[in-house]
Amino acid sequence: MVQQETRLRVADNTGAKEILCIRVLGGSHVRYGRVGDVIVASVKEATPGGAVKKGEVVRAVIVRTAKEYGRPDGSHIRFDDNAAVIIGKDNNPRGTRIFGPVARELRERAFMKIISLAPEVL
């Protein structure tokens, strides 16, 4: 679960290393974000020469959460960290590579470009 002020690891090669969630998109009373939700975030840590700079406000989609969640088949899944991929206005990733596994729920949310770039889909 991701909420305001949550820090997330960035799982792509845009140059950002860590972002801080400003808002979970999807309505005025949405408190928590789950895998597949889009957030507005601020870049807190970035590498020099990257596509995004520190302090930049970006949109990102959550690809991993440390809090376990249930699936319709009755199984549960959780990851070691909270991670997101920075996306543009067209919901396509701004980076060209994705690091680490991503959740299968992204397929249902129509983030097919992220699914195709990911090394592993769990």
Curated annotation (Swiss-Prot):
Belongs to the universal ribosomal protein uL14 family. One of its GO terms (molecular function) is structural constituent of ribosome. Keywords: Ribonucleoprotein, Ribosomal protein, RNA-binding, rRNA-binding. Gene3D superfamilies: Ribosomal protein L14. One of its GO terms (cellular component) is cytosolic large ribosomal subunit. PANTHER family: 50S/60S RIBOSOMAL PROTEIN L14/L23, LARGE RIBOSOMAL SUBUNIT PROTEIN UL14M. Pfam families: Ribosomal_L14. GO terms for biological process: translation. It comes from the Bacteria. Part of the 50S ribosomal subunit. Forms a cluster with proteins L3 and L19. In the 70S ribosome, L14 and L19 interact and together make contacts with the 16S rRNA in bridges B5 and B8. This is Large ribosomal subunit protein uL14. Binds to 23S rRNA. Forms part of two intersubunit bridges in the 70S ribosome. It comes from Roseiflexus castenholzii (strain DSM 13941 / HLO8).
